[in-house]
């Protein structure tokens, strides 16, 4: 896990919140995607928990940098209040993606979708792009660029105290 020095944590948390927060939606977000095992995952299956939906690709260096952060976050929170869904955003065979996810010890569901400018949650202007979905199914935040476990946890904590 990457550790942020305390003197920068408040500043980074503020920047993360400023660039990450989105306005309210009319309806809960929804998608259904297959994982590397061929199992369907519906976003609504995770209602009641925060869902970190991370769009990434195997060829994307910043994506690879944040994988350990997402693994740590998922491991720490999956049985409590939050999960990570990794959505692979490239044309890659299911077997190659499965092997990659095993090599990187990805402990969260690795889903597949076809690349394009948009997703079910909103635009994908670059990779990685991470959306945060509230326990009620509302997309509350988006971050383009890498995230850390601490920044995600801090943002969720801020949302809970609102």
Locate predicted features.
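N-terminal secretory signal peptides that target proteins for export/translocation
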Residues: 1-8
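Bacterial N-terminal signal peptides
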Residues: 12-21
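Boundary at the C-terminal end of the N-terminal hydrophobic targeting segment
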Residues: 23-28
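A short beta-strand-turn-helix
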Residues: 30-51, 121
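Short pre-active-site segment immediately N-terminal to redox-active cysteine/selenocysteine motifs
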Residues: 49-51, 55-59, 126
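Conserved redox-active cysteine motifs that mediate thiol-disulfide chemistry
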Residues: 55-72
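Conserved segment of the thioredoxin-like fold in thiol-based oxidoreductases
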Residues: 65, 75-114, 127
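Thiol/disulfide oxidoreductase modules built on the thioredoxin-like
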Residues: 99-106, 112-157
């Amino acid at each position: 896990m990457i550790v942020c020095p305390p003197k920068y944590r408040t500043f980074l948390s503020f920047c993360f919140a400023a660039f990450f927060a989105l306005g309210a939606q009319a309806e809960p977000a929804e998608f259904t995607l297959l994982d590397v095992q061929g199992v369907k995952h519906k976003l609504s299956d995770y209602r009641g928990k925060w869902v970190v939906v991370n769009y990434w690709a195997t060829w994307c260096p910043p994506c690879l940098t944040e994988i350990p952060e997402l693994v740590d976050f998922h491991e720490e929170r999956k049985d409590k209040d939050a999960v990570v869904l990794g959505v692979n955003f490239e044309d890659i065979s299911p077997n190659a993606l499965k092997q990659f996810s095993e090599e990187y010890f990805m402990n969260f569901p690795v889903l597949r979708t076809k690349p394009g400018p948009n997703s079910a949650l909103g635009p994908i202007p670059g990779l990685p792009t991470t959306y945060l979905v509230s326990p009620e199914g509302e997309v509350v935040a988006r971050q383009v660029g890498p995230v850390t476990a601490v920044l995600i946890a801090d943002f969720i904590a801020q949302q809970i105290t609102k």
